Amino acid sequence: MKKKILLVDDKATIGKVASIYLGKDYDVMYLENPIKAIDWLNEGNVPDLIISDIRMPLMRGDEFLRFMKANELFKSIPIVMLSSEESTTERIKLLEEGAEDYILKPFNPLELKIRIKKIID
C-alpha cells in the first residue's frame, strides 16, 4: 500500500509536477490552500507526510504549520515546507517550530523524492 502525501500549494503547476513525479511511489492528494487541507484532515484523512508552501493566500504555510503542531490529532504528521525564499532566519524558525525539512523552490523532483523517502520510508 502506498503511503499518503498531502501537498498544499497555491500554484497548480507545482501541484501537478509534484503529483506526477511523486505519484509513482506515493498516493498524493493536492489541495491549493491550508483551509482546504484542514477541512480534508478534519474529514478523517491522515497523510503520512504533508508538503506545504509558505506563501499562500487565505492562510500562510507557517500559520498552517503552527496550527498542525498545536493540534493533538495532527501534530505527529511530518511537514516539509517549500519556499522560494532563501532566508536562513525563516528556515531556522520553521525548523524550530516543528517542520521536518525546508526545501527551496524551484526544487529538483529527485531531491524532493529523496528527502521524502528519508522521512517516511
Show where each model-derived region lies.
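Two-component/phosphorelay signaling modules centered on CheY-like receiver
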Residues: 12-30
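Receiver (REC) domain active-site loop signature in two-component systems and cognate sites
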Residues: 56
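Acidic, metal-coordinating helix/loop segments flanking the phosphotransfer/catalytic sites
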Residues: 32-49
